[in-house]
């Protein structure tokens, strides 16, 4: 099931953001705890953070950002991560199915996301879940840990 994140989810989300297997593919570089708390509180206040859980255990997270005006039929999906302890258990597929259903229930027509072109596992998962590639943003993200720019692939799913 997916639900809005609460203050009680801070530690889980922080663990995901700082985990070496997930951080390279998330928006924020490693920051100190105080800065991360500011980021979390800002996202929390805007009610953008969601938790995916099964059997009462948090397994993953995502941000869902509804767009406005002429694009109010679209949501941007970001910060998608499954905790590495649960890699390979099918939770990524399950979470994406639930995200798609959530977006349908919100009356949305389109979900957009971007991910690093080097994140091949995520791209396969998104494609398996109905997302299609729409283009590549060259030198889009600076990966500080590797001192290089990386390309991002834009993807979408029409509902």
Question: Which role fits each region the language model picked out?
Answer:
Residues 70, 79, 83-97, 106, ...:
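Conserved glycine-rich acetyl-CoA-binding loop
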Residues 74, 123, 134-140, 152:
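A short, glycine- and basic residue-enriched loop/turn
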Residues 74, 110-112, 154:
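Structural preference for beta-strand elements that scaffold enzyme active sites
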Residues 112-115, 127, 132-147:
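Conserved catalytic-core motifs of GNAT/GCN5-like acyltransferases
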């Amino acid at each position: 099931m997916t639900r809005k994140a609460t203050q009680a989810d801070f530690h889980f989300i922080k663990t995901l953001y700082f985990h070496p297997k997930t951080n390279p593919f998330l928006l924020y570089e490693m920051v100190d705890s105080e800065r991360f708390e500011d980021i979390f509180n800002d996202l929390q206040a805007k009610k953008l953070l969601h938790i995916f859980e099964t059997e009462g255990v948090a397994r993953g997270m995502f941000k869902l950002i509804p767009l406005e005006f002429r694009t109010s039929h679209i949501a941007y999906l970001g910060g998608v991560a499954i905790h590495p302890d649960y890699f390979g258990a099918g939770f990524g597929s399950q979470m994406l199915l639930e995200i798609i259903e959530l977006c349908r229930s919100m009356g949305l027509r389109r979900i957009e996301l971007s991910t690093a072109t080097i994140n091949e596992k995520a791209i396969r998962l998104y494609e398996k879940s109905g997302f299609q590639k729409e283009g590549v943003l060259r030198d889009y993200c600076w990966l500080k840990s590797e001192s290089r720019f990386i390309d991002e692939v834009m993807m979408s799913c029409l509902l």
